[in-house]
Amino acid sequence: MLIVFLFCLPLLPKFFLQESIPTAEPVSTESSSAGSATVSQPEEAEPAPEPEPQPLVQTVRFSATGDNLIHAPIYKQAQRRASGEEAYSFDYCYEHIAPFYAQHDVNWINQETLCTDELEPSSYPCFSTPGDCARALYRAGVRVFSLSNNHTYDKGASGIAATLRFWGSIPEDVVTTGLWKGKEDYGHIPLQTVNGVTIAYLSYTEHTNGIPQNSSMQANVIYTSQTDVIEQQVKAARQLADFVVVGVHWGVENSHTVVDAQRALAQSLADWGADLIIGTHPHVLQNAQWLTAADGRQVFTAYSLGNFISTQEKPDQLIGAILSVQLEKTTELDGTVRCSVLSPRLLPTVTHYDAGKSNVRTYLFRDYTEALTKSHGVRQAYPDFSLEMIQSIARENIDPELLQLT
């Protein structure tokens, strides 16, 4: 009988169900007469404590690239690739490096050859490069161009005048260094401020291939032998900037050996106030090291970044490196400022060209493939050219803690 009752329960009249299930009375949260229970309101949470003041840390991701050495096959292919307003299109040369540059706030390069919009292009031994090359580098992300090297005087006074006009026509966010409009210009230190960090740029060269400055030149280089002038400039830059970056065109061509003159000048530059020293000219890789300046600062020196792009013909000349560092400025709560060069890494690059020095372009080693090595035009003379050979050259010349292959 009980089972029947349960199954029939849903059919009972509505009033029967309502009377059978008592309704709960709401609990009052109001105070009642003495002896009644009182429910208190929740207390408001205490405000979170103010965070402790922290030092201000400002950083710049900085890269430096070696010799942009434009031989005839490079500008001739650029002419064939051109369309639209430009007479030459060099973008193909740099398109594989542009994503890497985009990861940095500042990209510096040694512009080994004169760039102009006026002179006819020419190759070794006296170079002249279409201005469209520099514009392509600008599009790729380069903003700082070092102009002091052994080819600066290749076209004499007319070349200096033309290149000054060219660099005066490019966007204002470009910084050039290494050409000075006479002694009265030596006190004008190129400066750049990025992310609240001010960087000074100076560049010097060991020689100009025996071509002297003449009185009709509108600008001149400063030679590494002019140590009094260099000392004054570096010390002046030290007072103006958080970081002093010095490019030096020095050393022995096609030699991986750092000579005593390079080491001595690097130490002097560090003692005078340089924070980062970038070496170019040998066309091949040389090692890098930390130097301790007279005031205790740690100064990073890359003695040679090798070639960035060229159509030279030996494997060593086709393997360069891009330096990547972090420039960090820390302002303490008491106003004290500390500046440090951090995490230097040298990333190998490979200049690739096909048979007949065609289709010249540059890759980071980490993006280069064995298939590309097998199609490289250099294999005609060096059939063993391979990823293993490239790694071997890089490892033989760069300390392992500084080398980044992947």
Question: Where are these predicted regions, by residue range?
Answer:
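Acidic, metal/ion-coordinating pockets
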Residues: 5, 9-26, 35, 39-406
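N-terminal Sec-pathway targeting helices
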Residues: 1-3
